[in-house]
Structure formats: C-alpha cells, structure tokens
Amino acid sequence: MMKTVNELIKDINSLTSHLHEKDFLLTWEQTPDELKQVLDVAAALKALRAENISTKVFNSGLGISVFRDNSTRTRFSYASALNLLGLAQQDLDEGKSQIAHGETVRETANMISFCADAIGIRDDMYLGAGNAYMREVGAALDDGYKQGVLPQRPALVNLQCDIDHPTQSMADLAWLREHFGSLENLKGKKIAMTWAYSPSYGKPLSVPQGIIGLMTRFGMDVTLAHPEGYDLIPDVVEVAKNNAKASGGSFRQVTSMEEAFKDADIVYPKSWAPYKVMEERTELLRANDHEGLKALEKQCLAQNAQHKDWHCTEEMMELTRDGEALYMHCLPADISGVSCKEGEVTEGVFEKYRIATYKEASWKPYIIAAMILSRKYAKPGALLEQLLKEAQERVK
C-alpha cells in the first residue's frame, strides 16, 4: 500500500536533510535521509497530481536544459517536472550560442540564470568530463549568487553524466519501493545488474554504475555480472563495496549471467561499453579522430558479438527466484526481433514486463521535481502541506 500524502509529509518532516544546501550530482554523496526525502517528495507530488491537486509552486521562472547527448525519456521527464512545478523550459543549444565561440562556463552559467530556478544537464559522452563540468557550472552559480549577480541560486540536477545517472537510479528505486511495498522490504532482495549483448557500442557506464552505487545503500544483495573486460569505473565499484558493508547488504562481481540470475528477485540486463574502451573513445573524440573512432567501433562490435549468449531469455528468467524475478530496464531496450535482430532481451520477456518498465519510467518526472524542490526549499514538507491544504484543482 502506498502511503497517503499526509503520511508522506509526516515522514518528510521527520528526516534530517541538507539537500537545500547542495546539488544532487551523485547518489552516494547524499545521506540515507536525503535519499528518502527525494523518494517521499516524489511520491507526494505523484499522489497530489492523482488527486487533481495542482503542484505549481512557482508562478514564473525558467528551467534550463542542457543536453549534450540524445535523450527521449529524460528530456520529457525534465520538461514534465518543470511543468509540474510551474516553471517554463528553455533548452540551451550550445551550437547556436556564444559557447561555440569560446564563451566560458562561468559566464554562460550566469547569463542563462538571471530568472532560472533550475538547470538540468546531461553530459555523459566523455569519461572524466561530464560530472566535472556540472561541478564547474555549480561553482559558477555559487559565485554569481554570492556576488549578487543572481537573485537566486538555481537548483542543478544531474540528468546523466559519465559517472552516475541519479534521476534514473532514483526512479528505479522509487519503482522498487512501490513494487515491494517499502524500502525495508528491499533488504536481502537480490538484484542482478548484468551486461547484455547489444548490436551497438559506446553505451554509457552511468546506468549500471548508478544501480550498484544506489541499491547497495539499502541492504540489498547486489550482483554485478559482465564478461571479462567489460569493467566499470573502479572507483564506483569501490563505492558499491563500501555501501554494501555499511548497509548490511552484499556486493559481488561475477562473469556469468546465469550465476547472476540464479535466485534473483530483480534483474536488470543492460549493455554498456567497457571502461577501457570508453577511455579510448574519449581520447579519440577529443582529438576529432574519425578514422580512429570507426576502427574502435568495429573492434568493439566484434568484441560484443563474442557474447551474444548474454541474452535475457525465458530460459534465463527461469533461473530467477520462482522464475518470476522483476525485469527492469532504463529503456529503450534492444529487443531481439523487434528493435534489432539480436539484442539484450527476447520479445517474450520484454512483453511480459513491458507495463512494469513503463511504470518504472513514470517515476522519473516526479523524482526530478523532488530534486528541484528539495534544493529550492529547506522545508519541502511544509510546502506540500500547503499545497494539500489549498487543494487548487489542476484541471477545472
């Protein structure tokens, strides 16, 4: 049973959080209470909307989006989150701005933020650069606010970087909490974050890294599975190990999809490029070496093709707990015989869990909105209480 809005507000008010003083760039930088606050605020916003109560807390203001990579779900989730809160969206097209002519990050961050209350950034193409860029933007915003250039400090949200995809992993966690009933019920549950074959290369590391970095915070038994050579960023793996120790859960790495799926309660089969390949790709992209990139792609596709047996099939799902593990994916999945000839998951498995993955994705607008509210308001519980009391109809 999902909690009522009043119950969620009571829980939010009982938490110790400093999210109003910092940006949400990595989940493992936030305390357990701060993670719970985002989940609870998101759940309250979703419940208010379901009751036709407006969640518009801003009468004006901009939400800026900066997408340095393609996006469908996150782009529309961010736009939806801004709309939920009453903010208008403006996308920054860097190719059509003065950034293309050498304008500094410090200057751009201030120039776009005079009337901005939120900035969402996706920058996942270059290892070692995306999260660093977000922090540079954050520092520029801090300086602009401190110096009196900006009348308010915009909330900065990581819409995916080279290290983490916090809006995705938090939406995944919100869905798991809904599906299993509570965060407490996740303790001891086995989740298998596994590599899966894809006919494309260069998929970011941030989704699997986000999963192992977050689910290890809640006492879950997290298994990371991938073929030899498909490693993640070593520092993030260390974070997952330390998280598991602190939460009373476990974290282990295996090189067998079957072993990972065995008795799993949740499976998350998803392709990604090897860490070393992403490092090399970053160097080639920076050097604008098109021939080198073509050669690397050919090499990587051949490497992927050696592991077509890493495929989420009905037979593989039979290995899970009672053959009924929850299938998860950030979408779009590479569905064999549908979106590609051979991919991550069979049509049968995906179709069985298609609605579940859509419900998983449906949490993202509310998670993003919760991150923005938690940065802009020191007491989001009081704000939600006011919205509930006023009960302004969203649709008349």
UniProtKB/Swiss-Prot annotation:
How the protein assembles, per its UniProt entry?
Answer: Homotrimer.
Instruction: Name its species.
Output: Escherichia coli (strain K12)
Question: Transferase: is it a keyword of this entry?
Answer: yes
Question: Which EC number(s) are documented for this chain?
Answer: 2.1.3.-
- Name the Gene Ontology biological process terms: arginine biosynthetic process via ornithine; citrulline biosynthetic process
Gene3D superfamilies in alphabetical order = Aspartate/ornithine carbamoyltransferase
Instruction: Please provide, alphabetically and separated by semicolons, the GO molecular function terms listed in this UniProt record.
Output: amino acid binding; ornithine carbamoyltransferase activity
Keyword tags: Transferase
Q: Which family does it belong to?
A: Belongs to the aspartate/ornithine carbamoyltransferase superfamily.
Under the heading InterPro entries, the entry gives: Asp/Orn_carbamoyltranf_P-bd, Asp/Orn_carbamoylTrfase, Asp/Orn_carbamoylTrfase_sf, Asp_carbamoyltransf_Asp/Orn-bd, Carbamoyltransferase_YgeW
Sites binding carbamoyl phosphate sit at 71-74, 98, 165-168, 330-331
Functional description taken from the UniProt entry: Putative carbamoyltransferase. No activity can be detected with allantoin or 25 other related compounds, including 20 naturally occurring amino acids, N-acetyl-L-ornithine, N-succinyl-L-ornithine, L-ornithine, oxamate, beta-alanine and putrescine.
UniProt cross-references to Pfam families, sorted A to Z: OTCace, OTCace_N
SUPFAM superfamilies in the record: Aspartate/ornithine carbamoyltransferase
Recorded hits in NCBIfam families, A to Z, give: PRK07200.1, ygeW
Q: Where are the transmembrane segments?
A: none
Can you say what this protein is called?
Answer: Putative carbamoyltransferase YgeW
Domain free text: Contains a carbamoyl phosphate domain (CPD) and a second substrate domain (SSD), which are linked by two helices.
